[in-house]
C-alpha cells in the first residue's frame, strides 16, 4: 500500500513538473520541425570592419493593406550597426541614435539539399542594449509579404508565464552562423529565474553555439517560450523567457509584435517609435560595453575584418576586445 501511495505521488510530481516525455507522433513532430524552419532566420550585421551573425524569429502582422514581417532577436546581434550622431536642435546639442540595415537570410532546401538563400534588408524598429537594458531588438523586413508563417508566442497568465523545469524544448538557430543555419536541437528547461546583471533568464540544456543568439526556444508543439542569449558550455545555456519579452514590449508599446490578438499600429506610428530607450544617457558607439562575461558569453558569431582573406571567428565579449585591423 505504501509503495502504491509513493508511486502515485511520484507520478503526480512528474506530471505537474513537466518531466513526462511527450508523445508526439512522427508526423506531428515533422510538421513542427518544418514550421520552426520556416519562422527561423539568420541575421547578419555587417559594418565596415566586422561582420556578426546571429539568429532571429519571424512574426507577420497586417499593417494597413500590407503584410509586414518583423523579426525578434537579441540587441547585441545588431549592436555593431549602431551609430551615434551629434546634432544641434533648439540651440542645444543632442545625440541621435541611428542603425544601419541588417540582412535577414533565409536558407532554401529542396529534396534534402541546400539550393540557395534569400537575403532581405531589415531596419531596427526597437533596441535595448545589453548593458543598460533587456538586450532585445525588434526588426522590420523592408520587403512586403516576406514570411509565409509567423511565430506563436507562449503568452499566458498561468503560473506567471513560467515554463516548468523539465519541460522538453526545441531550439532552432544559426549555430556557427550561416553555415549552421536553421539547425535544430533539443533539451529541457533546467532552471528558471536565474539573475545575471540584474535581469532574469531561464536556463536550458538545448545545444547552442556562437550564432545561436536571438534564436527561438520552443515547446514541442512549436510555441515560442524564449530566446537564446548566453551560454556556458554544452548543456548550460541562458534564454530570455517570453514573460520578460512581454514586460519589455508592454513598456515600449510594441506588445502587438508578440500578441497578434492586439491591433497593430499604422506604419507611420511604427516609424515614429524611438529606436532606443534605455532610461540612461545615450552612449557613444565606441564607448566600452560590459559584454565580457567569462562564465556566460554571448552566443554570437563574429568575423573580424571581413575584408581579410582569412576570416577569424570568436564569441563576442565586448567591443574593446575585438582586435580589428583598420586599413
Where would I find each of the regions flagged by the language model?
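Bacterial N-terminal signal peptides
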Residues: 7-16
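Flexible, gly/ser-rich surface segments that form the specificity/activation loops bordering the active-site cleft
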Residues: 28, 116, 126-130, 148-200, ...
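C-terminal cap/linker of serine protease catalytic domains
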Residues: 21-31, 82-108, 115, 147-149, ...
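Catalytic-histidine neighborhood of serine endopeptidases
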Residues: 61-129
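Positively charged n-region of N-terminal signal peptides that target proteins for export
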Residues: 1-4
Amino acid at each position: 500500500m505504501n509503495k502504491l501511495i509513493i508511486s502515485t505521488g511520484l507520478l503526480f510530481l512528474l506530471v505537474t513538473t513537466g518531466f513526462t516525455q511527450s508523445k508526439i507522433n512522427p508526423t506531428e513532430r515533422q510538421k513542427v520541425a518544418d514550421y520552426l524552419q520556416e519562422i527561423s532566420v539568420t541575421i547578419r550585421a555587417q559594418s565596415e570592419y566586422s561582420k556578426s551573425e546571429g539568429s532571429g524569429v519571424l512574426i507577420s502582422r497586417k499593417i494597413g493593406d500590407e503584410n509586414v514581417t518583423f523579426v525578434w532577436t537579441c540587441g547585441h546581434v545588431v549592436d555593431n550597426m549602431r551609430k551615434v550622431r551629434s546634432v544641434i536642435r533648439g540651440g542645444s546639442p543632442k545625440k541621435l541614435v541611428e542603425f544601419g540595415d541588417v540582412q535577414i537570410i533565409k536558407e532554401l532546401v529542396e529534396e534534402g539539399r541546400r539550393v540557395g538563400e534569400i537575403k532581405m534588408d531589415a531596419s531596427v524598429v526597437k533596441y535595448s542594449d545589453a548593458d543598460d537594458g533587456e538586450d532585445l531588438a525588434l526588426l522590420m523586413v523592408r520587403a512586403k509579404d516576406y514570411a509565409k508563417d509567423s511565430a506563436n508566442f507562449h503568452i499566458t497568465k498561468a503560473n506567471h508565464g513560467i515554463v516548468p523545469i523539465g519541460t522538453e524544448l526545441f531550439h532552432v538557430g544559426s549555430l556557427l552562423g550561416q553555415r549552421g543555419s536553421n539547425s535544430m536541437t533539443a533539451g529541457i528547461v533546467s532552471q528558471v529565474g536565474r539573475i545575471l546583471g540584474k535581469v532574469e533568464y531561464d536556463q536550458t540544456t538545448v545545444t547552442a553555439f556562437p550564432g545561436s543568439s536571438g534564436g527561438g526556444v520552443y515547446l514541442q508543439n512549436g510555441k515560442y517560450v524564449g530566446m537564446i542569449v548566453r551560454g556556458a558550455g554544452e548543456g548550460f545555456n541562458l534564454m530570455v523567457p517570453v514573460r520578460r519579452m512581454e514586460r519589455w514590449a508592454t513598456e515600449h508599446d510594441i506588445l502587438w509584435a508578440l500578441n497578434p490578438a492586439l491591433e497593430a499600429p499604422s506604419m507611420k506610428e511604427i516609424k515614429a517609435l524611438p529606436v532606443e530607450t534605455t532610461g540612461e544617457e545615450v552612449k557613444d558607439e565606441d564607448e566600452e560595453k560590459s559584454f565580457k562575461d567569462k562564465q556566460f558569453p554571448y552566443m554570437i558569431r563574429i568575423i573580424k575584418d571581413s575584408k581579410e582573406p582569412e576570416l577569424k571567428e570568436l564569441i563576442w565579449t565586448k567591443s574593446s576586445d575585438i582586435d580589428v585591423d583598420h586599413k
